[in-house]
Each structure stands twice: as structure tokens, then as C-alpha cells.
Curated annotation (Swiss-Prot):
UniProt cross-references to InterPro entries, sorted A to Z: AdoMet_synthase_2_family, AdoMet_synthase_3, S-AdoMet_synthetase_arc
Official protein name in the record: S-adenosylmethionine synthase
Gene: mat
Enzyme Commission numbers on file: 2.5.1.6
Sites where the protein binds ATP: 141-146
């Protein structure tokens, strides 16, 4: 049995606190673009390594930087005058020694990475011309020898932690968290883009709950070729606002909701108009790990890790595995009858098996009528089960079925 500790979470349940702030940076935000590219490159490398070598080799592609371009958006359609620059950095296994033949096998790391980045941008930013609007530069280097050794040690056995680090998670999501998360998903959904094509992908949702009132302040890029006048622009905002309000009803209880879109607008002299749908075209820069946490949100009223999850290797990088695992365990513990709220923290020790954390800390708020003592064994059982099946987490990540931002 791993070192699993269960204790009472000594705090007011989040939905009963007087104030809560929650943020989500949408997929077209420069920071989220970097997160998405980093993770897409990692998933693509995993696939390439498995196809060519039969196993996932050491890599970390969590160093992606975006330097904003320059554009002249105009009502009816403007143009890009300087492309967005994307730098792919990090470390990966580029060559392997075949011990039988003595030959070195070179692996197409850079080609795989650039293709993955471009494929992601094509799907994520619908109105971007990949031939003209963006430059993708790959500078991924060979991995550190000592860390590769930790990665490769007894490959047939349990992977060993690459670092002494921790992951955190919580569940269930509060009303505010659900609304913020689902609002961005709605505005960037295929269905909404088909209905309101002028809505760009660069969307940031900031949720504030004061008592029973939730205010959503939304920054939403508009794509200029679909907007011929200021009246069109206002109409786009009105349509989007109505969609957000309607969608939020699924998650609201007795809360009042206020939705504010592009509050910095000042008639036609200052509106959030873009050529591509992202502010990355207008000098806004981006980096991996500067935005959403592993659960897709930024939650200053909850415990968070500053570790970037996207792009890290899914085999033994604690910054990735334990953050994702913490959220999975929290979700399952929160499903136990009698658990109102749950927080998870998992700490590793470098070089130790990832199934044997230094500590796995579970904090719970029981529902009225339930005692911590009766819930504790069930929570420990959930945590132990996931530690024993941690390879399933890796499999989900490698297959691209886990959201990292």
C-alpha cells in the first residue's frame, strides 16, 4: 500500500464562499496555442517512436514560444503583414544505437514535430493561412544523458520519477468553474462557428462569483472578413452573448448571471477585430504553461501547480503524470457517496517508481450525515487502484485522449 493520507478539508465548501474567481484561456489565446502545439508534438513523437522503435522514447517538448506577428485588420477583411513566429524547443531522442548491427538509427524528430505543429494550427485556428501567416522553427535538441538513463532504467518495469515534484487536482468543479469551462468550449465549438463564423478562436473567459451572482467577462476576437460594419460586429457580440446565456442555464442553480463581451470596445475606433481570429497576429506573445492548468482552468481559490503539463513525456515526467492523475483520482473520489468536495496532492521522489509516491494526500469535505472515518477507506481504495494502474493514464495521454490545458 502506498503512503496515502486522508484528512478533512478544513474550509468552507467553494460554492458557499462569498467570492470566487475562475479563468480559462481559449484555444486561440497565444499561451493556449503554445500548450496545444507542445502537446500535439509530444503525441506525434510518441506515435512515431512506437511505429519505428516499438516503444515511446525520451522526450520533453514543453518549450514552445510564440512571437506575435503584425496585421492590419479592417472591416470586410484586412491582411497580415508580418507572420507569427513559433519556436519548437525542448529535448527528444533523435538517434538510437542498434546493439545488434552496431548502426545508429536516426529518427525524424524535427520533421514529425513541425508537421504536428502545423496540423494542430490548421485545426485550432480556422482562418489562418499556414503558408503566409506563420513560421514554425524547430530547435529540439538531444535529451540529457542522465535523465534519459532514469527514463530507460528497467523499461520493462515501472517507470521511475524524472524529478522530485508534485501534482494537484480537485473535484467536483464548482458552478462557476463549470460555466467558465463550458462557455469557452461553446464559443469554440464547430456548431457555433458554423452559425456565427465571425467568432474567432482567441477567447478568454473570466468568471467572478459574488454570492449568488456570476459575472462572465469575455474577450472574444472577431474575424474581419465576416464583419462588414460596426453594426455587424455588434450583432456578432449579441448573438454570442445570447448563446452563452442559454448554455449557462444548464449549470446555473439559483444564480444570477451577467455576461459582458469585449468591454474595452469603443465604437469602431477600438474593437477586437482580427484577420486570423487570434491576437497572436497583433504582437501578443505566448508560452507553454502560462495559462490553463491540467484541468483546463486557472483557479486562484483552489490549490494549483505552477508546472506546465503540455509537451512533457507521458512515461515518467511527474509534472505531467501526477497533475493528470491527481485530477482523475479527485473526480473518482468525489463520486463516492457522502463526499462533497475533494483535493488531491501527490509528491514524487526522483528515481523512485512512479507508483510509489512519497505521499498521496487526500483532503475531503464530507456531506452532512457522513463521517470522514467511513469515507477514508473508500478514498484510499480509489487512489491505490489508480496508482496500480498508472499505465492507463500514460495510455490515455499517448492516444491523445487527455486534455492537458
Amino acid at each position: 500500500m502506498a503512503n496515502i493520507v486522508v484528512k478533512r478539508l478544513e474550509r468552507t465548501p467553494i460554492d458557499e464562499t462569498p467570492v470566487e474567481i475562475v479563468e480559462r484561456k481559449g484555444i486561440g489565446h497565444p499561451d493556449s496555442i503554445c500548450d496545444g502545439i507542445a502537446e500535439s508534438v509530444s503525441v506525434a513523437l510518441c506515435k512515431m517512436y512506437k511505429e519505428k522503435m516499438g516503444v515511446v522514447l525520451h522526450h520533453n517538448t514543453d518549450q514552445v514560444e510564440l512571437v506575435g506577428g503584425y496585421a492590419y485588420p479592417e472591416l470586410g477583411g484586412g491582411c497580415m503583414v508580418s507572420p507569427i513566429y513559433v519556436l519548437l524547443s525542448g529535448r527528444a531522442t533523435m538517434e538510437v544505437l542498434d546493439k545488434k548491427s552496431g548502426k545508429i538509427i536516426k529518427l525524424p524528430v524535427n520533421t514529425t514535430a513541425v508537421n504536428a505543429a502545423r496540423d494542430y494550427l490548421k485545426k485550432a485556428i480556422r482562418n489562418m493561412d499556414l503558408e503566409k501567416d506563420v513560421v514554425v522553427d524547430c530547435r529540439i535538441g538531444q535529451g540529457s544523458v542522465d535523465l534519459v538513463e532514469v527514463f530507460d532504467r528497467k523499461r520493462s518495469e515501472i517507470p521511475h520519477a524524472n524529478d522530485t515534484s508534485f501534482g494537484v487536482g480537485h473535484a467536483p468543479l464548482s458552478t462557476t468553474e463549470k460555466i467558465v469551462l463550458e462557455t469557452e468550449k461553446l464559443l469554440n465549438s464547430d456548431a457555433l462557428k458554423a452559425e456565427i463564423p465571425a467568432v474567432g478562436e482567441d477567447i478568454k473567459v473570466m468568471g467572478l462569483r459574488e454570492g449568488k451572482k456570476i459575472t462572465l467577462t469575455i474577450a472574444m476576437a472577431a474575424v474581419d472578413k465576416y464583419v462588414n460594419s460596426c453594426a455587424d460586429y455588434v450583432k456578432v457580440k449579441e448573438l454570442a452573448k445570447a448563446k452563452v446565456e442559454e448554455n449557462a442555464k444548464k449549470y446555473l442553480d439559483s444564480h444570477e448571471l451577467e455576461v459582458c463581451i469585449n468591454t474595452a470596445d469603443d465604437d469602431e475606433d477600438c474593437i477586437f477585430l482580427t484577420v486570423t481570429g487570434t491576437s497572436a497576429e497583433m504582437g501578443d506573445d505566448g508560452s507553454v504553461g502560462r495559462g490553463n492548468r491540467a484541468n483546463g482552468l486557472i483557479t486562484p481559490f483552489r490549490p494549483m501547480s505552477m508546472e506546465a503539463t503540455s509537451g512533457k513525456n507521458p512515461i515518467n515526467h511527474i509534472g505531467k503524470i501526477y497533475n493528470i492523475l491527481s485530477n482523475i483520482i479527485a473526480e473518482d473520489v468525489a463520486k463516492i457517496e457522502g463526499v462533497r468536495e475533494c483535493q488531491i496532492r501527490i509528491l514524487s521522489q526522483i528515481g523512485k517508481p512512479i507508483t510509489e509516491p512519497k505521499i498521496l494526500d487526500i483532503e475531503m469535505i464530507p456531506e452532512n450525515g457522513f463521517e470522514l472515518e467511513e469515507l477514508s477507506p473508500k478514498a484510499k481504495e480509489v487512489a491505490q487502484k489508480w496508482l496500480e494502474n498508472i499505465s492507463e493514464v500514460t495510455e490515455r495521454i499517448v492516444s491523445g485522449n487527455v486534455t492537458t490545458f
